[in-house]
Amino acid sequence: STNSTNTGHWTKAGAMALKCKILQFAASPLFNDNQGFAGGSSEAERQLLVWYGGYRSDLWTRCLEACREFFNALNSNGFYELNQATGATPTQADYRYAYRMGYIELDSPEVLHSVRVHGYDSFGAGSYCWHSWSDNGRNSYTPTQEYVEMFPWSDGTPFNWDETEAEGRLDEMFLTGTFNDGEQLLSNIVFTRDPRLYESVIVNGLPGNLGWSSVSVGGDPYELWVGGSHAGSNSFNETMRYATGYENMKYYLGSSDYLRQNTQWVALRLSD
């Protein structure tokens, strides 16, 4: 168990979770395989600096045991839990809000360990804070197409570009809707992909406003095509923001939303 005075400090739950994470990496094919991840011929691989020189099934057993110990302790002691969407029939906006507040709020029961960058977000203070990451100079590390395609459809079906293209549905890869007479913005929007995509990546057509104190998704959509109002020529030139046609979304809230809120970087979450 823990309380607000322990946020940001190491707890037993955080230490146990870190052990699980380390053992998961150790057991993964990145380090644990019959051949080195980079082929096996590099100096680092020959000296066994970046892998074990072979496959060891016991590493997966140790990872499993550590995870069991963690969840047994969690079942006994409680406190940590996933942030849940509210309502009898949650909408995609509800799931997005639950996901967002699960990592961004300082007292979220999902957070097993977090670190501090700054006490609170004063926006224009010049401190190296979250808003500094969302300007043209700093936010040039954009998501890849491969990363975006990892997120499934909203019903859990894996996304497959070739199949979607063959079905003539590429224009539905992020959302669908209708244009009503006299309106310039899309109405009756249906988000077609896993809600976590829209909380991780800014995609074409995504409404620009997110809620902080309540569930809300609205505003003008992002125009990320070549010549669009947001991307401009960046995606064509593969430079600056939207260089890949996408942008990072996490910790990306408006100045009025995040103003004077406590800031943290989540190192370990229960969902991990």
Question: What name fits each language-model region?
Answer:
Residues 217-269:
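Active-site beta-strand/loop architecture of penicillin-binding DD-peptidases
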Residues 1, 63-66, 72, 251-252, ...:
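Long, amphipathic alpha-helical regulatory blocks in the mid-to-C-terminal portion
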Residues 1-8:
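Flexible helix-coil transition and linker loops at the boundaries of alpha-helical arrays
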Residues 12-13, 21-228:
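An aromatic- and glycine-enriched ligand-binding surface/loop that stacks and positions planar moieties
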